[in-house]
């Protein structure tokens, strides 16, 4: 038998079998003794040699003739009917895995154990599956790439081949792997389908119990895939059980009029049902991918193995817009329970665990210790660097993780106290929030100040603004820059500069990165809830600043290919804060101090300054130190880093990656720059907030870094309130405002009904549900608002809201780490998308695509997404912009959207510089 092996860096380099090539069996080449060693020794996640394609023009034989299948694994002892089901959930580096986790946690009665596909060797998997009998079934997640690339699929192929007596459900990539491992061909779909809905017909298989079928039913599913199983290549062992309905794929809005989101079940519909027996006896009715050169009318959406309890679903049951998704997972649980109930054998050993709902895994402490040790010495792919992300298990009501040595020692804590004063109906009497900032903090061009500015006139989008400057004894400024990778071995490491209120400085080298430092700092603070329980807002002092996009390396993302010239994170510890309630017009003055120290005079001093402004309600205070702009610079326009042709070529590259299954959506960006000389950042921000007000706007100035941010961001990244509720509000879908009311309404409706924009938004909603699902209580993640259209001064945007209740043992910083960078700026799956974007974008994004906001001393936070923002570093102003690339994108339209998003902040800079020149 002649076998050829070729290395490929992406699945786009795969050459799929032509029609005249005979079907081959994957098993013989993946697990033959000769090849097995080279397969296992491949370096996982390597960009150069991470994938292997084995190809052969020889048919090695039928599946049942393979020696690997004849290998005898010990059969597992069945138990009495299970009251709960323990699932091993294999994560194929996807961004939707924890949506499955959330669903299974509530349906199974216990959370699943999540491992990535290269974290366990076969020997480790064998131990937990067969010796410890730790799991009742296996679910294989979606993921980027192809099952033909070992680095994309990891251990999953071997599990599918050898675990014949364990129920397995493969979703999307897992579905394709089930087909591929038994000899079916995985080929390009007639068209990539991502974030779109299809009607489904099924054959009445038990996996679809209590789920209707057919065109007239309300069973609609969300699809995220570019590859499919070629139905004509299905071996006799695999049975088709579901397929798309011809010409019934469209957008969410097209289907939503009759589709309840996440319906959990209803009586079976009137759709056509084809018995399994008929499929086994007569396969001729099943259409091929291409018949006589014509495009297939149906796409295979579900398969099952005729002998093993193995199932595959090409669509995504975990998506927010898939109906009956919960019912599908419930049916798989029932399949598992019934399977083990039927497996009666008195000759086999009994399970070595107590079958009770309190004990989720056998010898849980030892298992977690082993997992923790693996992650500390392994490939760094674990969630949060410790095993807490894998389990939320409890043994006899005690958190299992408390039995394992904690990764983080408890720091010594200091008690901070809060004093505050409220002045009712004061803001308008002193000229509003602008006058308040200019009087209190606007002198000296706003150096070392912050202003979290809800400048939108719509109070429903943002009620409170917060501001402050160099404060009391607790004030300090943090400036962090990641190290060059050539200098250190840790990709997280960097240099931190700390400046206190007396201008003394201290330098530290942070081996574990900035977020770990911030987590420890916040953990060292204790507080008395009575100090702030009557305040109507959450920020009462603490860290205020910005996190750059490159901090993604501290959040499980790959090594940065580019380094930013600006700092990667800058924060103040603000002990003195002024807050404005825009809804009630109240002003609050707040001051933090350490227990046992003298209280500051900030409350009284600030009160006197505010009272002195009484009567200035109609006059705006100006900064008297505004410099004159060089006339040669005032007329300079912003220059994009990439030309129109280069950007369009990058969009086309993104679409090729999407077609080949490497990503569902890629958020491509570029930078636009111009020299700004000695222009005043605060004056520029005041101009920007008038021209383009936004609910998550901000001004930050860090004088020792020569850095200012003037942001008119409309997007919230993530918020955590005092009740432990996390909220994300991603924006995906943007269109310009109309010049007349009629045109404006038409454009708004056009955005709302756009299939492309709905697909973009849905993909990011599912991604954010996944990110929150990693740190939220099972069953608590929900979507109160899906694809709402919000209108701003220059654009309409499509916005969704995702919420979930934070687990009590998860820190605020770990919540951010789980979701950063914001999915609306990366695409999905996030990890692979970030890798691709880093290869296409020719420079660091810097602070653009990162976050601005606060981490309050009381454990709350609120962060925006840094978009529509002018970043001034040294003498250069930069504006980042881009858009989400999907299969439905038009390269030319994507370039125009990028320019549209740049226009408002760029025009504000041009106008401001021109005005200053005239002065």
Swiss-Prot record:
The keyword Hydrolase does not apply. It catalyses: chorismate + L-glutamine = 4-amino-4-deoxychorismate + L-glutamate. Transmembrane segments: none annotated. Keywords: Chloroplast, Folate biosynthesis, Glutamine amidotransferase, Multifunctional enzyme, Plastid, Transferase, Transit peptide. InterPro entries: ADC_synth_comp_1 (IPR005802), ADC_synthase (IPR005801), Anth_synth_I-like (IPR019999), Anth_synth_I_N (IPR006805), Chorismate_C (IPR015890), Class_I_gatase-like (IPR029062), GATASE (IPR017926), TrpG/PapA_dom (IPR006221). GO terms for cellular component: chloroplast. Disulfide bonds: none annotated. The active site is at 172 (nucleophile), 316, 318. Signal peptide: none annotated. Residues 1-45 form a transit peptide. Activated by chorismate and inhibited by dihydrofolate and methotrexate. Pathway: Cofactor biosynthesis; tetrahydrofolate biosynthesis; 4-aminobenzoate from chorismate: step 1/2. GO terms for molecular function: 4-amino-4-deoxychorismate synthase activity. Residues 436-910 are annotated as: PABB component. Its EC number is 2.6.1.85. It is found in: Plastid, Chloroplast. GO terms for biological process: 4-aminobenzoate biosynthetic process; chorismate metabolic process; folic acid biosynthetic process; tetrahydrofolate biosynthetic process. Its main location: plastid. It holds the Pfam family Anth_synt_I_N. The PABA component provides the glutamine amidotransferase activity. The PABB component catalyzes the formation of ADC by binding chorismate and ammonia. PANTHER family: AMINOBENZOATE/ANTHRANILATE SYNTHASE, AMINODEOXYCHORISMATE SYNTHASE. In the C-terminal section; belongs to the anthranilate synthase component I family. Bifunctional enzyme that catalyzes the biosynthesis of 4-amino-4-deoxychorismate (ADC) from chorismate and glutamine. In the first step, a glutamine amidotransferase generates ammonia that is channelled between the binding sites of glutamine and chorismate and used along with chorismate in the second step, catalyzed by aminodeoxychorismate synthase, to produce ADC. Required for the synthesis of 4-aminobenzoate (PABA), an important component in tetrahydrofolate biosynthesis. Does not possess ADC lyase activity. This is Aminodeoxychorismate synthase, chloroplastic. It comes from Arabidopsis thaliana (Mouse-ear cress). The gene is ADCS.
């Amino acid at each position: 038998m002649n076998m050829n092996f070729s290395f490929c860096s992406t699945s786009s380099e795969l050459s799929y079998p032509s029609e005249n090539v005979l079907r081959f069996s994957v098993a013989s080449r993946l697990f033959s003794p000769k090849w097995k060693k080279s397969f296992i020794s491949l370096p996982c996640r390597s960009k150069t040699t991470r994938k292997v394609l084995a190809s052969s023009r020889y048919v090695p034989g039928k599946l049942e003739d393979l020696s690997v299948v004849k290998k005898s694994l010990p059969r597992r002892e069945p138990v009495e009917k299970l009251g709960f089901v323990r699932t091993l959930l294999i994560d194929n580096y996807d961004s939707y895995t924890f949506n499955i986790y959330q669903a299974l946690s509530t349906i199974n009665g216990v959370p699943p154990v999540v491992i990535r596909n290269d974290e366990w060797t076969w020997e480790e998997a064998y131990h937990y599956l067969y010796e410890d009998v730790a799991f009742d079934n296996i679910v294989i997640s979606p993921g980027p790439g192809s099952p033909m690339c070992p680095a994309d699929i990891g251990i999953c192929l071997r599990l599918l081949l050898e675990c014949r007596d364990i129920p397995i459900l493969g979703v999307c990539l897992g579905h394709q792997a089930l087909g591929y491992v038994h000899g079916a061909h995985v080929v390009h779909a007639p068209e990539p389908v991502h974030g779109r809905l299809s009607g489904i017909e099924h054959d009445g298989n038990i996996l679809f119990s209590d789920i209707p079928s057919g065109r007239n039913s309300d069973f609609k599913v969300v699809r995220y895939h570019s590859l499919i199983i070629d139905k004509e290549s299905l071996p006799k062992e695999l049975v088709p059980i579901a397929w798309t309905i011809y010409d019934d794929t469209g957008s969410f809005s097209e289907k939503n009029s009759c589709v309840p989101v996440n319906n959990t079940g209803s009586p079976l519909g009137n759709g056509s049902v084809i018995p399994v027996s008929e499929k086994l006896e007569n396969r001729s009715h099943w259409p091929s991918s291409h018949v006589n050169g014509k495009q297939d009318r149906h796409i295979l959406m579900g398969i099952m193995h005729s002998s093993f309890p193995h199932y595959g679903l090409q669509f995504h049951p975990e998506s927010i817009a898939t109906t009956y998704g919960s019912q599908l997972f419930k049916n798989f649980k029932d399949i598992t329970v019934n399977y083990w109930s039927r497996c009666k054998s008195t000759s086999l050993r009994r399970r070595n665990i107590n079958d009770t709902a309190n004990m989720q895994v056998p010898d849980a402490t030892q298992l977690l210790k082993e997992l923790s040790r693996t992650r500390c010495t392994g490939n760094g792919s674990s969630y949060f660097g410790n095993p807490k992300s894998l389990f939320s298990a409890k043994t006899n009501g005690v958190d299992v993780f408390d039995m394992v040595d904690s990764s983080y020692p408890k720091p010594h804590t200091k008690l901070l106290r809060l004093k505050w004063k409220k002045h009712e109906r004061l803001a308008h009497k002193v000229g509003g929030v602008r006058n308040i900032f200019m009087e209190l903090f606007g002198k000296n061009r706003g150096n070392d100040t912050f202003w979290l500015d809800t400048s939108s006139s719509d109070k429903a989008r943002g009620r409170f603004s917060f501001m402050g400057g160099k404060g009391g004894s607790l004030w300090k400024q943090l400036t962090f820059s990641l190290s060059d990778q050539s200098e250190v071995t840790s990709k997280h490491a960097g240099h931190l500069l700390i400046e206190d209120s007396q201008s003394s400085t201290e330098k530290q080298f942070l081996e574990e990165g900035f977020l770990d430092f911030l987590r420890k700092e916040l953990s060292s603070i204790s507080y008395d809830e009575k100090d702030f329980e009557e305040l109507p807002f959450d920020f009462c002092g603490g860290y205020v600043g910005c996190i750059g996009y490159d901090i993604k390396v501290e959040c499980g993302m790959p090594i940065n290919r580019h380094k930013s010239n600006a700092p990667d994170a800058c924060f103040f510890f603000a002990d003195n804060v002024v807050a404005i309630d825009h809804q009630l017009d109240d002003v609050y003055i707040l001051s933090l101090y350490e227990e046992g120290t003298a209280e500051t005079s900030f409350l009284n001093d600030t009160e006197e300054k505010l009272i002195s402004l009484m009567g200035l309600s109609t006059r705006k205070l100006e900064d008297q130190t505004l410099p004159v702009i060089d006339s040669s610079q005032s007329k300079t326009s912003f220059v994009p880093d990439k030309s129109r042709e280069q950007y369009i070529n990058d969009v086309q590259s993104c679409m090729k990656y999407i077609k080949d299954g490497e990503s569902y959506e890629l958020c491509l960006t570029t930078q636009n720059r111009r020299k700004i000389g000695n222009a005043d950042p605060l004056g520029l921000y005041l101009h920007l907030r008038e021209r383009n007000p936004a609910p998550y706007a901000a001004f930050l100035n860090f004088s020792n870094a020569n850095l200012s941010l003037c942001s008119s961001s409309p997007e919230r990244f993530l918020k955590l309130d005092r009740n432990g509720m996390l909220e994300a509000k991603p924006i995906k879908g943007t269109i310009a405002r109309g010049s007349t009311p009629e045109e404006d309404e038409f454009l708004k409706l056009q955005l709302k009904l756009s299939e492309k924009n709905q697909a973009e938004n849905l993909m990011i909603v599912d991604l954010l549900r996944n990110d929150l699902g990693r740190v939220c209580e099972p069953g608590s993640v929900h979507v109160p608002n899906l694809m709402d259209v919000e209108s701003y001064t220059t654009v309409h945007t499509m916005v969704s809201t995702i919420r979930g209740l934070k687990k009590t043992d998860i820190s605020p910083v770990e919540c951010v780490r789980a979701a950063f960078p914001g999915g609306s700026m990366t695409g999905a799956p996030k990890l692979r998308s970030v890798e691709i974007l880093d290869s296409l974008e020719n420079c660091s994004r810097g602070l653009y695509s990162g976050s601005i906001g606060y981490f309050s001393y009381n454990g709350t936070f609120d962060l925006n997404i840094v978009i529509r923002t002018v970043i001034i570093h040294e003498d250069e102003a930069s504006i980042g912009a881009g858009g989400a690339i999907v299969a439905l994108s038009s390269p030319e339209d994507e370039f125009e959207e990028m320019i549209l998003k740049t226009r408002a902040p760029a025009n504000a800079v041009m106008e401001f510089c021109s005005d200053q020149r005239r002065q």
